[in-house]
From Swiss-Prot:
GO molecular function, one term: N(6)-L-threonylcarbamoyladenine synthase activity
Record keywords, A-Z: Acyltransferase, Cytoplasm, Iron, Metal-binding, Transferase, tRNA processing
rRNA processing keyword on record: no
Designated gene of the protein: tsaD
InterPro entries assigned: ATPase_NBD, Gcp-like_dom, KAE1/TsaD, Peptidase_M22_CS, TsaD
EC number per UniProt: 2.3.1.234
Residue pairs linked by disulfide bridges in the UniProt entry: none
Primary localisation category: cytoplasm
Matching Gene3D superfamilies: 3.30.420.40
Name this polypeptide is given: tRNA N6-adenosine threonylcarbamoyltransferase
Keyword Transmembrane helix: no
PANTHER family membership: TRNA N6-ADENOSINE THREONYLCARBAMOYLTRANSFERASE, TRNA N6-ADENOSINE THREONYLCARBAMOYLTRANSFERASE, MITOCHONDRIAL
SUPFAM superfamilies tied to this protein: Actin-like ATPase domain
């Protein structure tokens, strides 16, 4: 079975073709970073219009890369939510339309389930069950995963997502958009210990998180100090250290609560080198294992949607002829695969 996956939930247009025997056959990705750079963030209307322009050409490119035609495709998977409603509707409309034209089933995919299952694309996929840390610009949550669709949210951010806090703090520091990766790069030049940021909500029980206070703490620290390059690097180091430490503390608690020793980290922030190092150290300390996707599959992409869609189609799930987008869609509302 071959599935084409379409991802248009925010500011990346991703198309991929996945074969249940051969694995990933093609992967096309277009980022709208340059389009939104002048605005310092994603402009939903511009994102939607650009998806309209790019999705069909990328579908053609993905087919060409895999040396396939539409007749070789057995199903179409598209991101139906959560995300920007206009951007979602572009992918959903195109996905549902080409499925109808090609005479194959279509299946809506949950964006965060796609991220959660992205490590399954690797040569050493994680076996169930495990604890998943889904950490991106729009979501930060800890999920107990017993199987595909068997999700229990253990905790989540009550305000800003971790990736959002990275980007907003980077903007406060005068870094270009998107600032999160640039802040992490700047942090590599920072001096450990010069600044000490708090670890929010780690002094109380529970697995919920909060990152808006770190952004405020960073703003106050920036105002109170010189704006030379080394000071900015030291602040970036302290901020990243606090975010990573907070996430690792929560992961450790989640593993204790569930009795598990396997953790999956996925989403855009899962590409953060410091976070990976600290989670690997945690796993080694407890005799556990940590899994994450390759860097190109940490950000939004069509490969994760194609894979997740494959699992749903095999379970007999399909979409009707109507087009739906669900900008808010809790992951624990998904049906388990039987």
């Amino acid at each position: 079975m071959r599935i084409i996956g379409i991802e248009t939930s925010c500011d990346e247009t991703g198309i991929a073709i996945y074969d249940d025997e051969q694995g990933l056959l093609s992967h096309q990705l277009y980022s709208q970073v340059k389009l939104h750079a002048d605005y310092g963030g994603v402009v939903p209307e511009l994102a939607s219009r650009d998806h309209v322009k790019k999705t069909i050409p990328l579908i053609k490119a993905a087919l060409a890369e895999a040396n396939l035609t539409s007749k070789d495709i057995d199903g179409v998977a598209y991101t139906a939510g959560p995300g920007l409603v206009g951007a979602l509707l572009v992918g959903a409309t195109i996905g549902r339309s080409i499925a109808y034209a090609w005479g194959v089933p279509a299946v809506p995919v949950h964006h965060m389930e796609g991220h959660l299952l992205a490590p399954m694309l690797e040569d050493n996929p994680p076996p169930f069950p495990f604890v998943a840390l889904l950490v991106s610009g729009g979501h930060t949550m800890m999920v107990e995963v017993k199987g595909i669709g068997e999700y229990r949210i253990l905790g989540e951010s009550i305000d800003d997502a971790a990736g959002e806090a990275f980007d907003k703090t980077a903007k406060l520091m005068g870094l270009d958009y998107p600032g999160g990766p640039l802040l992490s790069r700047l942090a590599e030049k920072g001096t450990p210990g010069r600044f000490k940021f708090p670890r929010p909500m780690t002094d109380r029980p529970g697995l919920d998180m909060s990152f808006s206070g770190l952004k405020t703490f960073a703003a106050n620290t920036i105002r109170a100090n010189d704006n030379d390059d080394q000071t900015r690097a030291d602040i970036a180091y302290a901020f990243q250290e606090a975010v990573c430490a907070t996430l690792v503390i929560k992961c450790k608690r989640a593993l204790v609560e569930t009795g598990m020793k396997r953790i999956v980290i996925a989403g855009g922030v899962s590409a953060n080198k410091q976070l990976r190092v600290e989670l690997e150290a945690l796993a080694k300390k407890i005799g556990g294992e940590v899994y994450y996707p390759r860097t190109e599959f940490c950000t939004d992409n069509g490969a994760m949607i194609a894979y997740a869609g494959m699992q749903r189609l095999k379970n007999g799930e399909t979409a009707d002829l109507s087009v739906h987008a669900t900008p808010r869609w809790p992951i624990d509302q998904l049906e388990p695969i039987v």
